[in-house]
Amino acid sequence: MTTIDKHGPTRRSVLAGAGAFGAAAFALPRTAISADGKILTVRSYSDLQVLDPAFRVSLPEDDIIRSIFAPMVVPIAGDVWDWKPIAVESIEQVDDLTIAFKLRDGIGFTDGFGQMTAEDVKFSIERIADPANESPYAGDWSALKEVEVKDTLSGLIHLKNKFVPLWATTLPTPASCIVSKKAVEEMGGKFTTETVAQSGQYLLTEWVPKQKTVLTRNPDWKHEPGGFEEIHILPIEDPATAELGFEAGDLDYTWTAVSSLPRLKENPPAGSVVLEKPSLAYVWLGINQDNEALKDVRIRRAIQHAIDRETVVDAAYFGAAAVGNGIVAPGLPGARDAVTYDYDPDKARALLAEAGADGLFVTLDILNQSERLTAAQVIQANLADVGITCEIKQNDSGTFWTLGSKDGDYFMNLQLVLSRFSMQPDPSWATVWFTPEQVGVWNWERFDNAEYKALHEQGLVESDPAERDRIYKAMQALMDESGSYVFLTHEVVGAIHKDTVAPGLKPNGESLLADFKPA
C-alpha cells in the first residue's frame, strides 16, 4: 500500500479549516519547478477532502482523482472541447442506447489488486448510478440501464434512453474513473482519502492536510506519461495570497483573482505568462426558502429587487467580469440575456411591507476570499438600503462546503449564501444541482419544483438545439420565480504561469494536471 503522510480528519463534515493555508504557505521550503524540470508546483483553492469519484466534493479533487484513478476518457487540453482515451483502447457509441468499450491491456491497480478489468468498469459506473448509494453524481449516469461485461477487457454500456450530455459531461469527468471493485468492497463500499488501488498516470504519494499533496508518476503506467515526475499541490484559499506566492517564486502556476487580471496583464511579473479564459462557472446569491425567516416568497422577491447586481460585480471584480443572467454560460443552449426581476429598491420595500417583515435580520455566508467579501459588502449595503440588516459570516473552505448539507446541523439556519459552482460544457450540468433530489446535497436553497425536474429530464434526451435552448431558459425562469436566486456573474478565468511551463488547460481554463509539461 502507498504510504501517505496523513494527519487529521478525513471526512468533509469535520474538515473545518481544511485548506486554510493563507500566508503561512510560503514558510514551506520552496518546491517550485526544479532546475531539471522534474517538479511542478501549483496552487489549489481548497485542500482535498474526498478521493472517491462517486462522492467527490470540489473541482480541485477532480484533477487529483483522474490523475490517480484512470478514467475511461479525459478532456483534451486546448481551446476546443474534445476528449481523448486514457484507460480505454477504444470506445464508441454504437447507437443511441449502446456504448462499446475495450480497456487497454496491462493497466494495474496498486497494492496487489491486480489488473483493471471490465468488471471494475461495471462496478465503478453502476455504483454511481445506484440510488441506494446516494452519490451526488448519480445524475451523470441517470440514463444507465446496466454495464454488460463481454470479456476481461471489453463490455457494453447500455442506456435506458438517449442521454445527450454523455460525451460532454459524464464520460470526460471523474464519473468515468475506474476503481477496483475488490478494493472498494474491502473498504466497505466507499472511501474518503484512502489511496488504495491507484491506477492512473500518477500516484498520490504524500498528503499533509492544509499544506500539500504530492503526485508522483506511476512507474507501472505503460502509456502516455504525465509531463512532470512530481506535482506538488498547495492548498491556498485566497487568490491574492497565491499571487504573492507566485511572485515570490513558490508557485509555477496559479489561478488568479479575476479582479487582479487588469493589473497582471498590464504589468506581468518577469518570466511569467498571464492567461484569461472564458468561464462556464456561475456565481449567485442563494436564499434558503425553507428557513423560517425566508419562507414568504415576497421576502425573497424583495431581496432579489434589493440587489444592484451590476454594482456587486463591478466592485468585486474591478470591471473584469460581466453581469450574468443565470446558471448557463453564454454560448450554451439556455444562456439568457436578462433575468425576470430587476433592481428596484422601492419595489423591495413595498414587498417587505406587504409581508410584514419590518426589521428583518439575515446572515450571509461566504467563502473567506477577498472577492467574495467585497461582493458581500455591497449586498449588505443594498439590503440595508431597504431596511434589512445583514451579518456577513466568513468561512474557510472546509466549513463552507458543508453549510447546506443535510448531514450537518446548520442547513436550516443557513439564510443567504454566496456561492460559485464550476461547470461542464452542457447546460444540464448546471441545472442538475437544483433538482429536488439535490435538496440538502448541493441544492442549498432547498428549491423543490416538480416542473423544473420534468424540464431537466426532458433536456437530457432532447437533441434539437432550439428546443434545448427553450427548456433551459424556462428552468431558469422558474428559479427566478422562486425568489431564491440572485444571479451575479460567470466571471472569467485568470491564471498565471512561469514561461518555463506549458500548462494543460481545458477551454475554460480549468487545469488538467497530467497535461502540464515543461515548455
Regions from the PLM with identified roles:
Residues 46-62, 84-87, 113-114, 166-175, ...:
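A structural "hinge/loop" feature
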Residues 43-95, 126, 195-199:
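N-terminal lobe/hinge region of extracytoplasmic solute-binding protein
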Residues 21-22, 40, 208-212, 217, ...:
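Detector for C-terminal structural segments
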Residues 92, 137-183, 206:
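Surface-exposed binding/hinge segments that line
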